[in-house]
């Protein structure tokens, strides 16, 4: 697996095996 870079307010989709297994929008980054 490769890390997914995300920014606040960025919509993202987590794909695995060509299918979307997770999707959403980053509301707050907890560092």
Swiss-Prot record:
Main location: cytoplasm
Entry keyword Glycoprotein: no
An annotated Gene Ontology molecular function: translation elongation factor activity
Keywords, ordered alphabetically: Cytoplasm, Elongation factor, GTP-binding, Nucleotide-binding, Protein biosynthesis
Subcellular localization(s) per the UniProt record: Cytoplasm
Pfam families: GTP_EFTU_D3
InterPro entries, sorted: Transl_elong_EF1A/Init_IF2_C, Transl_elong_EFTu/EF1A_C
GO-annotated cellular components: cytoplasm
Keyword Translocase recorded: no
Subunit structure: Monomer.
Function in brief: This protein promotes the GTP-dependent binding of aminoacyl-tRNA to the A-site of ribosomes during protein biosynthesis.
Similarity comment: family membership: Belongs to the GTP-binding elongation factor family. EF-Tu/EF-1A subfamily.
Name this protein carries in UniProt: Elongation factor Tu
Gene for this chain: tuf
